[in-house]
Amino acid sequence: MTDLRIAVLGVGVMGADHVARITSRISGARVAVVNDHLVEKAEQLAASIPGCSAVADPLDAIADADVDAVVLATPGGTHEEQLLACLDQRKPVMCEKPLTTDVSTSLEIARREADLGRPLIQVGFMRRFDDEYVRLKALLDGGELGNPLMMHCVHRNPGVPAYFDSSLIVKDSLVHEVDITRYLFGEEIASVQIIKPTSNPGAPNGVVDPQIAILRTVSGRHVDVELFVTTGVAYEVRTEVVGEHGSAIIGLDVGLIRKKGPGSWGGTLTPGFRERFGPAYDTEIQRWVDAVHSGTNVCGPTAWDGYAAAAVCAAGVESLETGLPVDVQLADEVTSPSPQGVRESDGCR
């Protein structure tokens, strides 16, 4: 099998991780082109990878005849143009979230893909590939807990970049719980409310942190999410589903060593997202590469999933301003060549 030739657009933290991942741990693929707005950085990275070149213009990188598929790790504001270019070139693309930065363009991207008659876009919600979430999904689908009634989530970060504002806690952090709610429960989210507890004195000036999100699904299930991104402690992600016949919780033991001693108890916590979800990223990219080789092109969250997440987060930002529940407005689901909707798009087997 000939290696898939991949262009990685954006070689910041996430993009550089993907370059290292594809180069060292993914089979059936190699990095052929890298691109970044910091041209010298891209050139230095390309020089360290056999057979790789740096291309200054992202659209030229997408159109390059030596590129079979694209990993998009550029800032969200550039995604619309770059995704449209991938569609025009009929090249499969793994797009890190967000699909785009607003609801209307996300919907337009999903519709444009559908018009082509073939799936090309996968969105990087990596939790669907995490072993614990996969097992929780299987447990729910198998009926062990009976009817799922509610879910409790914790999403904590030790800190965030200086540019982070209150709305990004919704759009950049809560978005993962939005997608995992749709994935686990197999239904859309009907409304969202953001509640503002007492703010952390350590949060940047003007940033509302922590926040509590209340999601209600179309069937009436409720999901509460604690979002606290300036804990100064560790990276913690936990999810507990409560059903009619019991409950199940994940995220307790990853990176945690519990210790007992004379009069003491303690352990260590996961320092960052790489340590917690590194294997999930590896699985995500490997399955995407395998899907492109097979011709299916998508093995996980679709453009519709990216659009639905954008719509929920837009309602969340509105609720952040008003404090009131806001209904989620979704367009009619597009007719797509890929398995759209939350029940069918949970990944390849």
Swiss-Prot record:
The name this protein goes by in its record: Inositol 2-dehydrogenase
Domain of life according to the entry: Bacteria
GO biological process, any: inositol catabolic process
Database matches in InterPro entries: Gfo-Idh-MocA_inositol_DH, Gfo/Idh/MocA-like_OxRdtase_C, Gfo/Idh/MocA-like_OxRdtase_N, MI/DCI_dehydrogenase, NAD(P)-bd_dom_sf
HAMAP family: IolG
Reported function: Involved in the oxidation of myo-inositol (MI) to 2-keto-myo-inositol (2KMI or 2-inosose).
Subunit structure: Homotetramer.
Keyword Magnesium: no
Keywords: NAD, Oxidoreductase
Catalytic activity: myo-inositol + NAD(+) = scyllo-inosose + NADH + H(+)
Gene Ontology MF terms in the entry: inositol 2-dehydrogenase (NAD+) activity; nucleotide binding
E.C. code: 1.1.1.18
Protein family (similarity comment): Belongs to the Gfo/Idh/MocA family.
